[in-house]
């Protein structure tokens, strides 16, 4: 920690501000400097990024620099930007420097932690792999989440990403007694506002912290907001020993903001114009997301793929850190099959018989095999019709359609729209249900019985009701 000192602004180029200090009073890299902005009447935070010689530092502003002029006094706080942490922040919405932005008054019962922190050491980390049960059949069966892992969410607008995110927040809060952090990184302000209001209505806000650095904010704020949310999550993991869910929407915007900051600082660009420190920036964030012996941080990261190019350095660098990928399909959403998770494209590194167990692995692969065969047969069905298929293929198609429908389930957060009560399905029940479908135990039940139910017993019950309705 450097000592407090006063400097003066010597140059301003957009969000980059150069500040000169007296001999021997230079701040450290990542120290927070404070300047009073007369235009806004607020304190503006500058983060030191470079020492450029002649007792001058180059800083990046966390808010607009409009109103700053050369010669203004800048105070060195002698420490990095700090984020508020603790129980008092639950249910609140804050910005990158920890200021509340939800108009609900000042934060109470909080302490402050620096946003730049080392990742947990190998000795502190938990090496055993554990599944984080989400209660969502399609995810738990085909792309299970590892506790303390990183999961990538791929999906466009309107495929049910927000509902899925909110359902996970609800399940972590209710079923696992855990907390969720949501980092809005460089996305639309309207979407952040909608999410806040929807969470309020769904009753999950009190177990959540929202941290926003949106599209309209300077690159410095967008680049650091994920670290603020992560610091809040680390408190609940390390001090309270909880399982925490950290949502980052969108991880691509984090890279994009880093690229802007890098260019403003005058660094030579790397491949496709990205910052030369891309892998380091990503690693510093991702390595802090892990399980320790006290608790875990499991991260779900929405990933925008520019021009659908998977080889772009931004998504490519993110992939190296991911343990599972969840692909949301527009085709499934159009058919009303929610959650619209693609069962063939979604993957998880822990779908391994040595980790999830032989039965889970074999059932998951059996489900994918049947669905893949159905996909292969769809062209033949479209041209010649079902009648031209062999008896074996007809049976596969029938089972595949039942599996497709059984992968759906009603969610708690969408209950008021669908009128169907939400369900949380334990992994054991999920495996049992799909295993029995694959074994052919329910070949005589109608397809409709498997749509939007929880366990296989509910499907059997629904089939009885459907049969009675037909008889009546």
Curated annotation (Swiss-Prot):
Location(s) in or outside the cell: Cell inner membrane
Any single GO CC term annotated in Swiss-Prot or TrEMBL for this entry: proton-transporting ATP synthase complex
Gene3D superfamilies: 2.40.10.170, Bovine Mitochondrial F1-atpase, Atp Synthase Beta Chain, Chain D, domain 3, P-loop containing nucleotide triphosphate hydrolases
Binding site for ATP: 155-162
Pfam families, A to Z: ATP-synt_ab (PF00006), ATP-synt_ab_N (PF02874), ATP-synt_VA_C (PF22919)
Keyword Transferase part of the UniProt annotation: no
The protein's enzyme class: translocase
Membrane-protein topology: Peripheral membrane protein
SMART domains per UniProt: AAA
Keywords: ATP synthesis, ATP-binding, Cell inner membrane, Cell membrane, CF(1), Hydrogen ion transport, Ion transport, Membrane, Nucleotide-binding, Translocase, Transport
GO molecular function, one term: ATP hydrolysis activity
Catalytic activity as recorded in UniProt: ATP + H2O + 4 H(+)(in) = ADP + phosphate + 5 H(+)(out)
Chain's role: Produces ATP from ADP in the presence of a proton gradient across the membrane. The catalytic sites are hosted primarily by the beta subunits.
Subunit structure as annotated in this protein's UniProt entry: F-type ATPases have 2 components, CF(1) - the catalytic core - and CF(0) - the membrane proton channel. CF(1) has five subunits: alpha(3), beta(3), gamma(1), delta(1), epsilon(1). CF(0) has three main subunits: a(1), b(2) and c(9-12). The alpha and beta chains form an alternating ring which encloses part of the gamma chain. CF(1) is attached to CF(0) by a central stalk formed by the gamma and epsilon chains, while a peripheral stalk is formed by the delta and b chains.
PANTHER family per the UniProt record, alphabetical: ATP SYNTHASE, ATP SYNTHASE SUBUNIT BETA, MITOCHONDRIAL
HAMAP family: ATP_synth_beta_bact
Name of the protein in its database record: ATP synthase subunit beta
Organism: Fervidobacterium nodosum (strain ATCC 35602 / DSM 5306 / Rt17-B1)
